[in-house]
């Protein structure tokens, strides 16, 4: 008799569940809760996960689950309360987790004696001034370039007293407050002008900038004039985006969402006292159906009564609306009402609009009143009539919801472009008979030059595309100067996964090695010793053969298969990343040697000069006095160094 599969066991649990309301928990092999859901009928809901036409996000859950548990409740509202409690307790991987949320950037003017201005997405209660949020990141960057070239503010992360100024002072990009070369009062004059620009009081300041642009053009300094022109345009663009006002003083939120596979994008427009004060954009795993997403999101998004506005508007009816409104009022003690204002389905042309056009529409929306994009309203529907709002008010709220939905859909499309290769992930699992979908794959490659400058590259792919925030480079300690790829592989695998285990971090579903059976066996030895239970494979470049540990007979994948294409992408990316870092180390060593070969410059001074100026070529622009202060050598010695630099460059 064939052994029963995990899927069949889970299906039996679903079929035996009661038809009462309750909460269910999916767990993986380690007993970790990976998803929590609620149901009016536990049996009906759990059984629905095993129908043949389920979507990708459901197949992901079933492939990763090892067991199901459920808790019965007296009614659906109790199930909602219990679900919320369990989600906060277990923080399951496939429930909404707002830690990964994304918002539009703001500009931060720090609360310091010598402030700096920079872009951030994190707003803290630290006394700093914040301006924004700004949808157009390019305009923010152009504005910062304007600041950098015209106001010479400090650029260091922390202001520390120094004896000699940094490179930015010598090239005219900083006034060196760290060395006392400018007073706080004088520095503050630039800060006042920048603040006026950001607050919209810009006529005098922009006039000065336009005069500078005109002067630069007359002097044929066209690059400088172009920077000033772009900066002035950025200032006007940001002024349009900084606030959006309307005539309704009541506070409210507009929430819309868009699904893509197992991920959901949710946009929130926050209106307070007639002003758009924020646009929050969140991405998260969620296995909820579209009609259920609202209750899970709201219970995660709002955590106290003062965060909840009197009104929340959504674009479509959702399961559990009444329950979540009851939860807000009774559990958070917030007096609020959730209202539905249906939006017409967008045309195919609108949905396929390019990203550039989409961004333009967002900017236009942000620079006008929020009723920017709605045509003359059709007669009110029965649902709209129940809201007791005028046609003009309905039009107004529809425009805001349309803007929220547009943001969510654009984010979903952007994510699809970033990581949409799920077909290859499924094909890889099927062809290599892997135990679960390899959603997270980590690839390794070793690079060296005759055993020197040995580095190991770790690259990460998530759901079929690069996950660059998890890329890592390892300078190998035990094999530098020795050609031993197997020992190098053992070292990097041990360092990587010992750390992940100690931190309790998520492990990958598959490890890919750039190499053949020898490298695979070396990596597998460490994986087995750590008892990770992660499959290890290798891709040999010569014939594109896939190797498993302790099996010299390779698997040959079809040349045009999605699975092989994905493995090649990962292998090639790891190879590129390791070689790039290896070459960088070799160049840095060459440059350091060039500094060390200069008179009066030893290893320590070479390190200081390399960090400050980057190359000996850049020393030619310095005065002997500046070099003397930076390298801490006498003026005569500095002159000899500069003479040596000029002689060397002339010979080359």
From Swiss-Prot:
Domain GIY-YIG: 19-96
Top-level division of the source organism's lineage: Bacteria
Domain UVR: 203-238
UniProt keyword list: Cytoplasm, DNA damage, DNA excision, DNA repair, Excision nuclease, SOS response
Compartments where found: Cytoplasm
Gene Ontology molecular function: any one: DNA binding
One of the GO biological process terms: SOS response
GO CC, alphabetical: cytoplasm; excinuclease repair complex
Family annotation (HAMAP family): UvrC
Role summary: The UvrABC repair system catalyzes the recognition and processing of DNA lesions. UvrC both incises the 5' and 3' sides of the lesion. The N-terminal half is responsible for the 3' incision and the C-terminal half is responsible for the 5' incision.
Family: Belongs to the UvrC family.
Oligomeric and partner information: Interacts with UvrB in an incision complex.
Name this protein carries in UniProt: UvrABC system protein C
Organism listed in the record: Treponema denticola (strain ATCC 35405 / DSM 14222 / CIP 103919 / JCM 8153 / KCTC 15104)
Record lineage: Bacteria, Pseudomonadati, Spirochaetota, Spirochaetia, Spirochaetales
